[in-house]
């Protein structure tokens, strides 16, 4: 068998496709890598400190509707009845989350039986006892949790958000 009989005839389309992939790879390696400390995360900005409720307003497994960091961002304040990571208050059992599903922005509802926030749109579920960790569904990130503080009078303040709220480029909107 002749050596040239083993060669494969690459058509024009295959050649151009291969050249395009090679050019894209060369361009990607020529771009400077983005530094990890290049700028603040969209979720790590200056947040307002807003009073959400008082300890006396909350009952175990009864969601308390709130809005943070502004009126266009619905959330829920929950007293879970047992201490959890990220919980505040005398029993470390109070947490707050955005109620916009990070997948498509559907409004979430609280299910007391398993202490989860569930999405009716595409069935994502988030564990309120595990800092809003996704436990099921289409979402690709955990639920944004509000950073809380309780003062000596029992007032509960939200002072930040740990993830980007659905539909926003920045959690704190320009006034």
Residue ranges and their predicted role:
Residues 115-123, 133-143:
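Short cysteine/histidine-rich metal-coordination sites, predominantly Zn2+-binding motifs
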Residues 34-114, 144, 149-175:
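N-terminal pre-ligand scaffold of iron-sulfur
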Residues 108-113, 125-132:
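Iron-sulfur (Fe-S) cluster-binding segments and ferredoxin-like electron-carrier domains
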Residues 1-23:
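N-terminal secretory signal peptides and thylakoid transit peptides that target proteins
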Residues 29-32:
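C-terminal segment of classical bacterial N-terminal signal peptides
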Residues 20-21, 106, 124:
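Solvent-exposed alpha-helix faces
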């Amino acid at each position: 068998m002749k050596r040239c009989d083993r060669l494969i005839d690459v058509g024009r389309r295959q050649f151009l496709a291969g050249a395009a992939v090679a050019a894209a790879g060369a361009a990607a390696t020529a771009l400077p890598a983005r530094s990890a400390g290049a700028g603040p995360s969209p979720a790590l900005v200056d947040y307002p400190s807003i009073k959400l409720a008082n300890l006396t307003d909350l009952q175990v497994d009864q969601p308390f509707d709130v809005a943070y960091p502004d009126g266009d961002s619905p959330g829920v304040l929950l007293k879970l009845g047992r201490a959890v990571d990220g919980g505040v208050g005398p029993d470390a059992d109070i947490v707050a989350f955005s109620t916009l599903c990070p997948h498509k922005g559907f409004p979430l509802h609280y299910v007391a039986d398993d202490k989860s926030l569930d999405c009716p749109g595409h069935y994502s579920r988030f564990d309120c006892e595990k800092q809003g960790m996704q436990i099921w569904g289409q979402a690709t990130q955990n639920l944004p949790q509000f950073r809380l503080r309780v003062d000596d009078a029992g007032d509960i303040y939200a002072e930040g958000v740990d993830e980007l709220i659905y539909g926003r480029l920045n959690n704190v909107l320009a006034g």
